[in-house]
């Protein structure tokens, strides 16, 4: 919960749905799978299981950031790196905290042991995806502060057998950014920026495969 009780779950879901709408309209050949379409809680592992079950090619985990530092603001993207020791670990700790509501939280510690091995198969493509989204959002939202692409051990990304990134759309604990995120028009702009990044990544990826 952020400034004036703005809730991350509502912000993130709306951006995800807007993103899905852009993808369906501009790239109808894609099959868009949502981990949730209303106000329900789905365990972190169940989200990646759903993506794997549907043989997903890209996994996007969309969130709104928070910090005790009210001045913290900006858009950032994270890649999976279980052994991260930089300040990104604070974000990972917060995003991973939801496992306390699950039946078997110990499973995540076990899965993290294998994450660094399995991640190597998708790390390069995940980085390309992250850079593409970051570049597009910067273009579509030039006044938004860009915090860059970082790495941390996010449980929600562990086990997804595909390129995957975690997106933090902005800080709901920052007054000005929370007010922006609370506007439908801004969330649509944000979703469009993410869409353009995904579209660019897919087109580049497909082009490389054709030229091989």
Task: For the regions a language model picked out, list residue spans one by one.
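Catalytic-core regions of hydrolytic enzymes
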Residues: 1-110, 119-131, 211-212
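Active-site-adjacent mobile loop/cap segments within catalytic or ligand-binding domains
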Residues: 6, 68, 115-212
């Amino acid at each position: 919960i952020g400034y004036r009780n703005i809730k991350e779950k509502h912000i993130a879901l709306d951006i995800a749905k807007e993103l899905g709408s852009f993808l369906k309209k501009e790239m109808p050949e894609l099959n868009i799978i949502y981990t949730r379409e209303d106000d329900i809680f789905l365990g972190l592992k169940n989200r990646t299981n759903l993506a794997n079950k549907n043989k997903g090619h890209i996994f996007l985990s969309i969130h709104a950031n928070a910090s005790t530092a009210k001045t913290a603001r900006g858009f950032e993207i994270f890649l999976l790196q279980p052994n991260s020791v930089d300040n990104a670990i604070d974000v990972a700790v917060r995003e991973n905290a939801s496992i306390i509501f699950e039946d078997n939280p110990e499973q995540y510690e076990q899965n993290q042991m294998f994450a660094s091995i399995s991640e190597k198969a998708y790390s390069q493509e995940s980085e390309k995806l992250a850079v593409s989204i970051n570049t597009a959002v910067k273009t579509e939202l030039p006044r938004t502060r860009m915090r860059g692409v970082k790495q941390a051990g996010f449980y929600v990304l562990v086990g997804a057998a595909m390129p995957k990134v975690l997106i933090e759309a902005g800080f709901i604990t920052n007054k000005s950014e929370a007010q922006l995120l609370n506007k439908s028009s801004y969330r649509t702009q944000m979703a469009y920026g993410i869409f353009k990044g995904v579209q660019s990544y897919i087109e580049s990826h497909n082009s490389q495969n054709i030229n091989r």
